[in-house]
């Protein structure tokens, strides 16, 4: 598998970097149940580019999405580009792969230093100072995410509170057994749902430890 990925990346990076590319240090990162993340270096014209490949796994590419709310790679690329250009602390998206590259829906972005491992961030001594900064940094980054112009990503679906409640209820109904606690919670939410927003904003659907990178200075990038 890695040889196939490396060959496809060499061709794609060569097109976008303007020179023949050599792929080094290719490895698949752990995590990401519904998406594959590959780390690699592309060396072209004497310059080393530290990059990340995001792709659908073969079982997902061309088939059903991993979940009803999952974004396709093209939309994810568009959201990431709009966020990066809007000043969000996020990896810079570089280019999308084509069908001819043979890797399914995929794109390449720059690699950012830091760790997403909660145990290290919460306990290890090198991150002691970072732990005092991460919470306010995440608040500032969340506000920046909310300021991104969603009109720049026309393929991004608008999901009102009522839509999300209905989606959760449909998911619970597939369990084919009573879920009284969830039904009570959804009923409470449904009775108190806000009116449709006049101006929608971009939100991160899974804003938590594990979906950001941090080093000794604090948050380096928001992921996913």
Give names to the regions the model predicted.
Residues 202-204, 209:
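Catalytic-loop of the protein kinase fold
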Residues 203, 221-224:
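Activation loop entry of protein kinases
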Residues 27-161, 166-188, 192-199, 218:
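ATP-binding pocket architecture of kinase catalytic cores
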Residues 20-28:
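Short secondary-structure junctions
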Residues 1-21:
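Juxta-kinase regulatory segment immediately upstream of eukaryotic protein kinase catalytic domains
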């Amino acid at each position: 598998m890695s040889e196939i990925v490396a060959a496809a990346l060499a061709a794609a990076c060569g097109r976008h970097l303007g020179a023949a590319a050599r792929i080094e240090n290719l490895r698949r990162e752990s995590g990401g149940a519904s998406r594959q993340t590959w780390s690699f270096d592309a060396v072209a014209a004497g310059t080393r580019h530290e990059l990340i490949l995001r792709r659908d796994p073969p079982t997902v590419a061309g088939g059903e999405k991993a979940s009803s709310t999952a974004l396709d790679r093209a939309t994810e690329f568009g959201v990431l580009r709009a966020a990066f250009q809007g000043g969000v602390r996020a990896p810079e998206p570089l280019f999308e792969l084509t069908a001819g590259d043979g890797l399914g829906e995929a794109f390449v972005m720059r690699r950012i230093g830091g760790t997403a491992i909660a145990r290290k961030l919460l306990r290890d001594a090198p991150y002691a100072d970072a732990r005092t900064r991460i919470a306010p940094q995440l608040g500032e980054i969340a506000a920046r995410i909310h300021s991104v112009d969603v009109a720049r990503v026309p393929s991004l679906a608008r999901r009102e509170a009522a839509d999300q409640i209905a989606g959760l209820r449909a998911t619970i109904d597939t369990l084919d057994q009573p879920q009284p606690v969830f039904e009570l919670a959804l009923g409470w939410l449904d009775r108190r749902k806000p009116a449709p927003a006049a101006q929608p904003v971009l939100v991160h659907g899974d804003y938590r430890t594990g979906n950001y990178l941090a080093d000794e200075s604090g948050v380096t990038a928001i992921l996913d």
